[in-house]
Curated annotation (Swiss-Prot):
<keyword id="KW-0809">Transit peptide</keyword>
<dbReference type="GO" id="GO:0006120">
    <property type="term" value="P:mitochondrial electron transport, NADH to ubiquinone"/>
</dbReference>
<feature type="transit peptide" description="Mitochondrion">
    <location>
        <begin position="1"/>
        <end position="38"/>
    </location>
</feature>
<keyword id="KW-0560">Oxidoreductase</keyword>
<dbReference type="GO" id="GO:0004497">
    <property type="term" value="F:monooxygenase activity"/>
</dbReference>
<keyword id="KW-0813">Transport</keyword>
<feature type="region of interest" description="Disordered">
    <location>
        <begin position="33"/>
        <end position="53"/>
    </location>
</feature>
<keyword id="KW-0472">Membrane</keyword>
<feature type="binding site">
    <location>
        <position position="88"/>
    </location>
    <ligand>
        <name>[4Fe-4S] cluster</name>
    </ligand>
</feature>
<keyword id="KW-0496">Mitochondrion</keyword>
<dbReference type="InterPro" id="IPR006138">
    <property type="entry name" value="NADH_UQ_OxRdtase_20Kd_su"/>
</dbReference>
<dbReference type="Pfam" id="PF01058">
    <property type="entry name" value="Oxidored_q6"/>
</dbReference>
<comment type="function">
    <text>Core subunit of the mitochondrial membrane respiratory chain NADH dehydrogenase (Complex I) which catalyzes electron transfer from NADH through the respiratory chain, using ubiquinone as an electron acceptor. Essential for the catalytic activity of complex I.</text>
</comment>
<keyword id="KW-0520">NAD</keyword>
<protein>
    <recommendedName>
        <fullName>NADH dehydrogenase [ubiquinone] iron-sulfur protein 7, mitochondrial</fullName>
        <ecNumber>7.1.1.2</ecNumber>
    </recommendedName>
</protein>
<dbReference type="GO" id="GO:0032981">
    <property type="term" value="P:mitochondrial respiratory chain complex I assembly"/>
</dbReference>
<dbReference type="GO" id="GO:0045271">
    <property type="term" value="C:respiratory chain complex I"/>
</dbReference>
Length: 213
């Protein structure tokens, strides 16, 4: 019986070896086809490249970038708004200047002269007769200058949107940087708008744009 079973075991072992070799060859062919044809689900996923900020290409560009950061820090830390109260929103603007909110701690100080201001807060309803005065005051402000539209009336006319004597948004007269919704918006909303303006100034790259020209 042992003599009869030995050839059977040998043939079974040979068949198993052939099947394993065939499987290995088939797997190698699959990997080769994947490598030649393109990516597939059988390949392990490659790690994604991390988002890295581009480094300055030269020493001059690096110096200009750091100088830009310094100037932006100085600008956003000393915003001097021009008081341009037109309606009830100006009461909330004055509320922000009161000791409860104390906007001076953010470097925001009201100025009465447009030549000493770099921010204009349009608070209230802008009429057609007041529009030329608004533009004239804006032109007298030194560069860079920013405009904050406070309230629904300044944003788009608000309650008086269909009136014949009201401008439907002060952005038709001057370019606006920050819009503050509300009728009227609270002092907290105005303070939040000022903080958003500071964040916008922080992202400016005026010197870098000038340097790359």
């Amino acid at each position: 019986m042992a003599a009869l079973s030995a050839p059977g075991l040998r043939s079974f072992w040979i068949l198993g070896l052939r099947s394993s070799v065939g499987t290995a060859v088939q797997a190698q062919g699959v990997h080769q086809s994947v490598a030649t044809d393109g990516p597939s689900s059988t390949q392990p996923a490659l790690p994604k490249a991390r988002a890295v900020a581009p480094k300055p290409s030269s020493r001059g560009e690096y110096v200009v970038a750091k100088l830009d950061d310094l100037i932006n820090w100085a600008r956003r830390s000393s915003l001097w708004p021009m008081t341009f109260g037109l309606a009830c929103c100006a009461v909330e603007m004055m509320h922000m200047a009161a000791p409860r909110y104390d906007m001076d701690r953010f470097g925001v100080v009201f100025r009465a002269s447009p030549r000493q201001s770099d921010v204009m807060i349009v608070a209230g309803t802008l009429t057609n007769k007041m529009a030329p005065a608004l533009r004239k005051v804006y032109d007298q402000m030194p560069e860079p200058r920013y405009v904050v539209s406070m309230g629904s009336c300044a944003n788009g006319g608000g309650y008086y949107h269909y009136s014949y004597s009201v401008v439907r948004g002060c952005d038709r007269i001057v370019p606006v940087d920050i819009y503050i919704p509300g009728c009227p918006p609270t002092a907290e909303a105005l303070l939040y708008g000022i903080l958003q303006l500071q964040r916008k100034i922080k992202r400016e790259r005026r010197l870098q744009i000038w340097y790359r020209r």
